[in-house]
């Protein structure tokens, strides 16, 4: 008796589905979990610098006030407004990807990139001003006023925290550029837009870090709760 051949039917491969996932839902859950784990490590990274800042602020409060007075309030405020606006455009971009509105997605991502570049431009002008005044930690550091050594610690943390944050903004701009290209190409659909959501999470995290940096660095001289 001849054996009957069994026909194996392979389900069609969903667009955007990587081979090691069973379906798009499993892929979405895995990538979202991976992004949150990454963001937790970022929280610990910046959290260490925030902790050091608060410890030294408690030890040298008057020096911290003096250092904050050397900050340009308007540069910090303008950059805060820029990043808040960029969070809005990113949120709208995520929504556009969920609705399958490719044109809106690309436009909103490009606008978000422009906001990011605007932030970096303002930050570059601010950095240049500090550099000209020798407010950079090292042998040539100079600060007109008391507590020069302690203020140098303030500026060390200022450059470290804002420098790493600006680096994260730059990385975000580059990633958003790639996502905008893939969105223009039509890679994202209402069923497969998790990449846009994850990039949105990253960008909102970067913006949130700045929301903490802004009062710590620019507003301390205007409010003295720990006197």
Question: PLM features: residue spans?
Answer:
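...captures the hydrophobic TM-helix bundle architecture rather than a specific catalytic motif
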Residues: 1-227
